[in-house]
């Protein structure tokens, strides 16, 4: 087991699973996702939908293809999310002024309102998460997680 495992389950002995990094990442992901879902239940928005609204707000007129690339989503997923947000009146599409083949995305007033509510919920969710760590640990955690997903 190497250096005695520093992380012990309070509920029960999980044996060698305790030494599997991926197992702990899965447990952490589950806890974060559950809290996110509870925090966002009244907004009826998914994590990906909020990410799309936020990026479109940060970059008005962003091309749908560029949006998907930046959020690391395939074309089909991007189109499905954009379609749903447009159907709900949160986004509008326009032909790109620079390239008529591309769709430029913009938030509608309803999209701005939904994003404002989502940002409030995200602050609540982030506070819940960050309360478990020091500022230095947060920086290190983000750096380590980035190594995994990049």
Please report, for each region that a protein language model flagged, where it lies by residue:
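Surface-exposed charged/polar residues within alpha-helices that form helix-capping/stabilizing sites
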Residues: 23, 38, 54-55, 113, ...
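C-terminal regulatory/oligomerization modules of transcriptional regulators
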Residues: 1-17, 135-150
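Short, structured helix-loop boundary elements
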Residues: 14, 18, 22, 46, ...
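N-terminal helix-turn-helix DNA-binding core of bacterial DNA-binding proteins
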Residues: 14-19, 26, 30-77
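DNA-binding alpha-helical recognition surfaces that contact promoter or target DNA
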Residues: 80
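Charged, amphipathic alpha-helical coiled-coil/dimerization segments
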Residues: 4, 33, 61, 83-143
């Amino acid at each position: 087991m190497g250096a005695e495992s520093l992380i012990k389950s309070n509920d029960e002995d999980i044996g060698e699973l305790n030494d599997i990094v991926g197992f702990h990442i899965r447990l952490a992901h589950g806890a974060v996702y559950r809290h996110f879902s509870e925090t966002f239940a009244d907004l009826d928005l998914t994590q990906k939908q909020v990410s799309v609204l936020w990026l479109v707000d940060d970059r008005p007129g962003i091309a749908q293809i560029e949006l998907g690339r930046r959020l690391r989503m395939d074309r089909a997923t991007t189109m499905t999310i954009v379609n749903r947000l447009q159907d709900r009146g949160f986004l509008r599409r326009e032909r790109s002024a620079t390239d008529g083949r591309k769709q430029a995305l913009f938030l509608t007033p309803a999209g701005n309102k939904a994003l404002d509510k989502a940002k409030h919920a995200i602050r609540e969710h982030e506070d819940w998460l960050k309360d478990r760590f020091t500022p230095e640990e947060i920086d290190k955690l983000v750096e380590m997680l980035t190594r995994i997903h990049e």
